Each structure stands twice: as structure tokens, then as C-alpha cells.
């Protein structure tokens, strides 16, 4: 049995384990495993904390985005309302402008009609006065005729104008 290799491997193994125990290798291995376990636990805690912070940031950014979208919608709605109000004001101003221009045109037309009527009356009065002067000058002779014609022309001109 002493000549077999397996025996010597077993003896060497037992001696080596005894030496490890004697020098405290099991404590060092346990402490190393404990340190590694603690480091892994810390890394997991850090990762969990980072994940929570990331989730908070994501929620905050979503909230900000939604707020910005609402604000943008409010701005668009306000702009549409302003545009509609401006269009209505422009339409009202245009209608007022057209009404004033129409009234001014009607006033000018009425003035032109009045002027035309006055011009026609004046022309008719002049024609009537000339005709009356012509008739009187042919029928009445002398200084009486001249005085009568002048008087009639003055009276006729005053009455027709």
C-alpha cells in the first residue's frame, strides 16, 4: 500500500489540508469570500440605487415632456384664437371701410346730382332770360324797352337762382 501512488497522493492531500488549516487558509478563504460577497452586495445596492435614480429621471422627463406638450397645445390654441380674433377685427374694419366709402360715394353722387340740377337751372334761367330779352327787344322799342329789359333780366335772374 505504501508503494501505490494513490496512497501518497491521499497522504499529500491530507497533509496539505492540515497545513492549510494550521496556517488559517480556511479563514483567509472565508474572509476573501466574505469581502467578495460584500463587494458584490455593495455593487448590487449601487446598481439598485442607480436604477431608482434613472427611473426618477425618466418619470421627471416624461412629466416635463407632457407639461411642454400641454403648454405647446395651449400656445397653439391661443394663437388660433388670436388669429381668429384678428381676422374678425379685420373683417369688421373692412366692412366699416366699405360702408364709409359707399356712403362717401353716395354723398358725392348726391352732390353731383345737386350741382347738375343747379347747372341745368342756371342754364335754363340764362336761356329764358336771353329768350325774354330777345322777345322784348323785338316787341318794345326805345329807352322804355331798354329799362324794362334790364329790370326784367335782373328780376328773372334773382327768381331763378
From Swiss-Prot:
The chain crosses the membrane at residues 5-25. Keywords: ATP synthesis, Cell inner membrane, Cell membrane, CF(0), Hydrogen ion transport, Ion transport, Membrane, Transmembrane, Transmembrane helix, Transport. It is a single-pass membrane protein. The keyword Transport applies. F-type ATPases have 2 components, F(1) - the catalytic core - and F(0) - the membrane proton channel. F(1) has five subunits: alpha(3), beta(3), gamma(1), delta(1), epsilon(1). F(0) has three main subunits: a(1), b(2) and c(10-14). The alpha and beta chains form an alternating ring which encloses part of the gamma chain. F(1) is attached to F(0) by a central stalk formed by the gamma and epsilon chains, while a peripheral stalk is formed by the delta and b chains. It holds the Pfam family ATP-synt_B. GO terms for cellular component: plasma membrane; proton-transporting ATP synthase complex. Belongs to the ATPase B chain family. It comes from the Bacteria. InterPro entries: ATP_synth_b/b'su_bac/chlpt, ATP_synthase_B_chain. F(1)F(0) ATP synthase produces ATP from ADP in the presence of a proton or sodium gradient. F-type ATPases consist of two structural domains, F(1) containing the extramembraneous catalytic core and F(0) containing the membrane proton channel, linked together by a central stalk and a peripheral stalk. During catalysis, ATP synthesis in the catalytic domain of F(1) is coupled via a rotary mechanism of the central stalk subunits to proton translocation. Component of the F(0) channel, it forms part of the peripheral stalk, linking F(1) to F(0). One of its GO terms (molecular function) is proton-transporting ATPase activity, rotational mechanism. This is ATP synthase subunit b 1. It is found in: Cell inner membrane. The keyword Endoplasmic reticulum does not apply. Its main location: membrane.
